[in-house]
């Protein structure tokens, strides 16, 4: 079974996976959208859950034109709808937020 919270990926690898810049990841960290683990030498290590979370945020900001605060809020709303078995609004059914942590 895959441990989604195990820190595995450096900031460079994470940026490459997400097709973004390391500075963008640092900004997301500064805003509290994701908090990577740190090594003994203070290097950032991202988990698979961090990458899933960042990918969901990117889909909402790039694909739907939301700002970062709105993307975070929408993820929380979708998680609440899913947790209570309430159908999602049309157009938001394909966004997977099951393993996202915001």
Regions found by a protein language model. Give the residues of each.
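Short coil turns linking two alpha-helices in DNA-binding domains
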Residues: 21-23
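Arg/Lys-rich, alpha-helical DNA-contact motif
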Residues: 2-16, 26, 30, 35-36, ...
